[in-house]
A protein has these predicted regions:
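Long, low-complexity, charge-biased intrinsically disordered regions
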Residues: 1-186
Length: 186
């Protein structure tokens, strides 16, 4: 089963910008015995690593950039078949948007069950799938994980300057002596 949370997004003055919705799978209903701890636990950057990155960045006059990866979990593919039953309100929305009619005959008790293709907030394995997806991508663009903290990545730029990136779920902090490298990462 899933839930939908809707909240107002406001600017720094408190002025309404837009509504933000988040679908959350009912991971508490997943059978945890099907997964090993290493399939569900995702590392997060250590506070000491963040302090070290900031301290080093300041002492070396590096440039800083922080970022948020929008809808991060949806970038990771589900590895197993995970079924999710939509509540009646979400089923109604799905049917209204389903121009091909593929879900019309699959409704039971005003609900439809779907297969998740992408990781979704709330699934017990989603955080780990997202971390693996992101760390694999960072390796393809030249970053190496730090041996002490798996959420800190480093690479040398084409100008032989170091860029350091720290990840906490879908938030990141990047520092580099090479401002062009920060621009490339955007």
């Amino acid at each position: 089963r899933m839930s939908c949370f809707i909240k107002e997004k406001k600017d720094s003055n408190g002025t309404f910008i837009k509504l933000k919705a988040r679908l959350v799978a009912g991971g508490h209903q997943q059978d945890r015995t099907l997964y090993n701890q290493d399939e569900t636990s995702s590392p997060t950057v250590a506070t000491s690593s963040v302090f070290s990155i900031i301290s080093t960045g300041i002492s070396e006059s590096r440039k800083f950039m922080s970022f948020d990866i929008s809808q991060a979990y949806l970038n990771a593919d589900m590895k197993d078949e995970v079924l999710m039953t939509l509540d009646p309100a979400m089923t109604k929305i799905l049917l209204e948007q389903d121009k091909s009619g593929q879900f019309k005959d699959k409704v039971s008790n005003e609900r439809v069950t779907v297969i998740l293709n992408k990781a979704l907030y709330g699934c017990i394995q989603s955080a780990k799938l997202w971390y693996n997806h992101l760390s694999d991508y960072l390796r393809t663009i030249g970053f190496s994980p730090n041996p002490v903290d798996p959420c800190v990545f480093n690479r040398m730029t084409r100008n032989q300057k170091q860029t350091t990136l720290a990840i906490h779920v879908d938030d990141g902090l990047t520092t580099s002596e090479d401002a062009d490298d920060l621009i490339l990462l955007q």
